[in-house]
Amino acid sequence: MTNRRQFLKDVVAGLALAGAGPLLPRLAQGAEAPSMGPAGLPAGTLESSLLDALPGKKPLIKRTFRPPNYETPLEYFNQAFTPNDAFFVRYHHADIPEVDAQAWRLEVGGESVEKPFTLTLEALQKDFEAVELAALCLCSGNRRGLFEPHVAGVEWGLGAMGNARWKGVRLKDVLARAGLKKEALEVVLQGADRPLVATAPDFAKSLPVWRALDENTLLAYEMNGAPLPHWNGFPVRLVVPGWTGTYWMKHLTSVQVVAQPFKSFWMNPAYRIPKGKFAVVDRFLSQESDTSTPITEMVVSSLITNLKAGQQVRQGQRVEVRGIAWDGGYGIQTVEVSSDGGRSWAAAELGKDLGRFSWRQWSHAFAADRKGVRTVMAKATNRLGSSQAFELIFNPAGYHNNVVQRLDLQVV
């Protein structure tokens, strides 16, 4: 009898032979295509990045189809929260489950708990206090496609991120029911998605126990007031505010507490940065080596959301520059904008503070008083005094690209 995994392998093979036409996500018809990404992406990236709509999603920028990796077009970042149907999609494996909420179970256990147990979705929602917070989910490789020289990996542009209100229960409350032993070191997380090839490593990650016990680390079951979308982790996913999305395990099925560093391809060698390259406050000490460290918290960054490179504006026009800024949860202190290529800077007006893990909207206006090229830049600084980089900090996996953005406008 053919099992589901073999069936999916056969489907993939069939798609390769048949051109994948009928089973591809539908291509948006009759709509103006948004920008597929900034200039500078590797050759062939823009040509292959079609505007596709996965079931239940608006047309998003397709970076890969198998596994599905789709980024959010820029226009959806001109609001406080990213709509669920426009939220980016990130998977490492192509065997993505259709989870029955009634049949879903979460196994909580491991060598370093006193009382392992199993939770249903109903019990998770009824037995523990519900909390809600705003937090940015950002892929570790966002803007990887802008690295020079280019590096291997999904060639993300600007949109492998989204801001949402997440509702769920604190992971620490669930772990308290299990009872942690004193030797507990890491919490291992496993989701229901699987590789198509049996020899490929399952996507499993761990958190240091102190981060798992942080009051802001959630087992989320709602996103922007609705159940989690299928493509964003239904029915339950981990939310680790301030840390990059690699830890935000989707379709969560297992939480295991262990007394030793967890060994997994996705912990080492994947998702590592050279030691000492970036100023990191939240370190994952049990997973560090002499030369590298796991990527953890997001670095301070910003994005101009209402203008595009090469856009024309009229001489004498007052040009509004709008955008968003974020960091690893310390809070944005200032955003400065330059309209003359960095020779002078002015403070932008910050929008409503939605919480330290949310992005912060900002705006600034300048007069386009002379014809020619006007180079617009934006630079964010957080409450620790950390600012964006003016030059790329190269690392072989293409992480933490927070270089100050430069957009050339044409004043005509």
Residue positions per predicted region:
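N-terminal export signals
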Residues: 6-29
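Structured, non-membrane catalytic/scaffold regions adjacent to prosthetic-group chemistry
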Residues: 31-412
